[in-house]
């Protein structure tokens, strides 16, 4: 099934607001053939100035590519870790149906997606060769999965030497074919255009290599052969990750510009490559079953931005500049949750008072830090203050999984056109009560020329097999707006995070729990949050100055988790050797020895990160527990970057 298809009842059809009672003519210039608006009457103007940039959003091929990327990440997040082995064949069948469905070609969609984003084409010879290689990979991989399914269904006592030789042969053929085909997805001059294709093929290859660790000796491979496959997997994990991050940055930097329109294209590339490439490579380390010998509970804390809510191509030149938008986006910060939005509204007059409308002119945002702090954070004010009554929506911890925003325009005979957002529906889901509801910002006045922007068009659900409130892929966590030049209106846009984020920092009783360090509720003065390198799924904690206590967390445990004890492991990069410590509410005090992994001038790459583990373990009491990370004997001006803390159950 195409993961981006939606049933008819999920599609919002926008029509002029029939509930709004107006007595004035909606199109004053259309009645007078001698009145001109840049030599067009009003109706013609509205018809011809529809935003051409929406063509990208309406491209079904691009939507299919994004939907497939989201679906693949969602499927893998649900099974990472060794329990993978128990449900492996059913996972592979679902995975195959996603990346090689019978009714579509996601690989062509991945290629077309980037062609649209950067306005370049892959040469036909390179595309044809890549597609031919992919067809061969599909055949090899399907043959292997079918053989694996038969192998697993056959009782141990009935497995023959012939069947053992056969599955080993099919595995080896598929693995070598992937290894030999990968250069076809990294052809010189087309590396950026092939990026999602490369990432998806690399992911499939690493999934396959993992099976040598799960089944290798069972299939008759020697321990030396299994070790060789393992070292190949580690080497390729680094190689594939670095390739994706490097060419993502090349592509992104190539789209930097100076105008509003340049920023929209830049942000689309950033968003769609995050969904189809960067989110995927975050998962590569989990295929190392020697490190992740249990299931894994993890989360993606990165932010992505949907398109600004802007409907008229004619007004592109009045948008804010590239730098003004990029510089006003929130800097890296501790993770927080959307609590509420205070909407300010102003009147936009139309021609001689006609076709006037109220619009979203500015806003405050209220957020809550990660569990552990009860304070509310109020954002700076964005936009223009109200001339109309202020509206405040409180989301109170519920997850907003969809927004539908309506826009309106007012046109004047002198050629000036004004834009505004008149209404936004926020669909929210309370997963504690399993209830859905909708809250609405409504400016209370529009002139009937309405277009709509639906967040689902840019952030499709993980699957269409469940209702949207269960299958959504992202949740809203921030809103900003920018003033247009020449006071032509206000442009709002939304920030989203992945649905995998756990509001409560819950430690699992049976899985390895990854807690991103940005989920802390407090930092020391010597620590800060910096932008992540692209393969961590979020931002990093950076320590540059001496500090005993670095970060404070609160974690949640159920009764089963309270019976466990946990080893603690930290993923980090460092320019020095030092000792970290982890302390909990029970006063368990664990020391972690950190080794130097990089020099001060080195860039952060996959290879600069390492894992360090405590020698002893800790337990918890009570369902809420404090946790502190600190540093001993840290020398100022050295650098340490912390990505995640992992809690590994040791007593099942």
From Swiss-Prot:
Chain positions covered by the region annotation Disordered: 1-33, 433-465
Keyword annotations of the record: Sporulation, Toxin, Virulence
Effect of substituting residue 21 to P: In strain: EG5144
Composition bias, Basic and acidic residues: 1-12
One GO term of the biological process aspect: sporulation resulting in formation of a cellular spore
UniProt cross-references to CDD domains, sorted A to Z: delta_endotoxin_C
Mutagenesis / variant outcome for changing residue 590 to I: In strain: EG5144
InterPro entries xref list: Galactose-bd-like_sf, Pest_crys, Pest_crys_dom-III, Pest_crys_dom_I, Pest_crys_N_sf, Pest_cryst_cen_dom_sf, Pest_cryst_dom_II
Comp. bias regions, Polar residues: 14-33
GO molecular function, one term: toxin activity
Impact after mutating residue 97 to D: In strain: EG5144
Position of the signal peptide: none
Misc: Toxic segment of the protein is located in the N-terminus.
Binding partners and assembly: Monomer.
Biological role: Promotes colloidosmotic lysis by binding to the midgut epithelial cells of Coleoptera. Has moderate level of toxicity to southern corn rootworm.
Family to which this protein belongs: Belongs to the delta endotoxin family.
Name of the protein described by the UniProt record: Pesticidal crystal protein Cry3Bb
């Amino acid at each position: 099934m195409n993961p981006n298809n939606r049933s008819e009842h999920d599609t919002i059809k926008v029509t002029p607001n029939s509930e709004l009672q107006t007595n004035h003519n909606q199109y004053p210039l259309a009645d007078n053939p001698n009145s001109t608006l840049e030599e067009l009457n009003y109706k013609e103007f509205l018809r011809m100035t529809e935003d051409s940039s929406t063509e990208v959003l309406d491209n079904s091929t691009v939507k299919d590519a994004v939907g497939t990327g989201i679906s693949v990440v969602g499927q893998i997040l649900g099974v990472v870790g060794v329990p993978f082995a128990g449900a492996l064949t059913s996972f592979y069948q679902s995975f195959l149906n996603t990346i090689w469905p019978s009714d579509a070609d996601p690989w062509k969609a991945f290629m077309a997606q980037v062609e649209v984003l950067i306005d370049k084409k892959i040469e036909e010879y390179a595309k044809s060769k890549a597609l031919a290689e992919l067809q061969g990979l599909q055949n090899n991989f399907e043959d292997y999965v079918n053989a694996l399914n038969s192998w697993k269904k056959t009782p141990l006592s009935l497995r023959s030497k012939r069947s053992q030789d056969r599955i080993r042969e099919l595995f080896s053929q598929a693995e070598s074919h992937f290894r030999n085909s990968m250069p076809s997805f990294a052809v010189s001059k087309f590396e950026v255009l092939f990026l999602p294709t490369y990432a998806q093929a690399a992911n499939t290859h690493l999934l396959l290599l993992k099976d040598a660790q799960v089944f290798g000796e069972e299939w008759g491979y020697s321990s030396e052969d299994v070790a060789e496959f393992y070292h190949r997997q580690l080497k390729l994990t680094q190689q594939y990750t670095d390739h994706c991050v490097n060419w993502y940055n090349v592509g992104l930097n190539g789209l930097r510009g100076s105008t509003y329109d340049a920023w929209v294209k830049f942000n689309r590339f950033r968003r769609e490559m995050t969904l189809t490439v960067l989110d995927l490579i975050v998962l590569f380390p989990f295929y190392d079953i020697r490190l992740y010998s249990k299931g894994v509970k993890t989360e993606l804390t990165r932010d992505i931005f949907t398109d600004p809510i802007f409907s008229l191509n004619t007004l592109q030149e009045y948008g804010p500049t590239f730098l003004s938008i990029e510089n006003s986006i929130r800097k890296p910060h501790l993770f927080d949750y959307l609590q509420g939005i205070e909407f300010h509204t102003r009147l936009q007059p139309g021609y001689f008072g006609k076709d006037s409308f109220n619009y979203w002119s500015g806003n405050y945002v209220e957020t809550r830090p990660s569990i552990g702090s009860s304070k509310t954070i109020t954002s700076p004010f964005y936009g223009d203050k109200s001339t109309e009554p202020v509206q405040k929506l409180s989301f109170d911890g519920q997850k907003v999984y969809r927004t539908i925003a309506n826009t309106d325009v007012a046109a004047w005979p002198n050629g000036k056109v004004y834009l505004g957002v008149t209404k936004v529906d926020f669909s929210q889901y309370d997963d504690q009560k399993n209830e859905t509801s909708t809250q609405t910002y409504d400016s209370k006045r529009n002139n009937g020329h309405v277009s709509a922007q639906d967040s689902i068009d840019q952030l499709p659900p993980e699957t269409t097999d469940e209702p949207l409130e269960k299958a959504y892929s992202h949740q809203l966590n921030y809103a900003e707006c920018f003033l247009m030049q020449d006071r032509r209106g206000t442009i709002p846009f939304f920030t989203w995070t992945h649905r995998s984020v756990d509001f409560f920092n819950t430690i699992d009783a049976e899985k390895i729990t990854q807690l991103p360090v940005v989920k802390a509720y407090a930092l020391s003065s010597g620590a800060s949050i910096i932008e992540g390198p692209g393969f961590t799924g979020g931002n990093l904690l950076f320590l540059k100055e001496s500090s005993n206590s670095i970060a404070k967390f609160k974690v949640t445990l159920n009764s089963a988790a309270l019976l466990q004890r946990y080893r603690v492991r930290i993923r980090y990069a460092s320019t020095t050797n030092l000792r970290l410590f982890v302390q909990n509410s029970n006063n368990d005090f664990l020391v972690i020895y950190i080794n130097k992994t990089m020099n001060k001038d080195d860039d952060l790459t996959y290879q600069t990160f390492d894992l360090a583990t405590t020698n002893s373990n800790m337990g918890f009491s009570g369902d809420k527990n404090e946790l502190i990370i600190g540093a001993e004997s840290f020398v100022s001006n050295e650098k340490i970057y912390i990505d995640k803390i992992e809690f590994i159950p040791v007593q099942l």
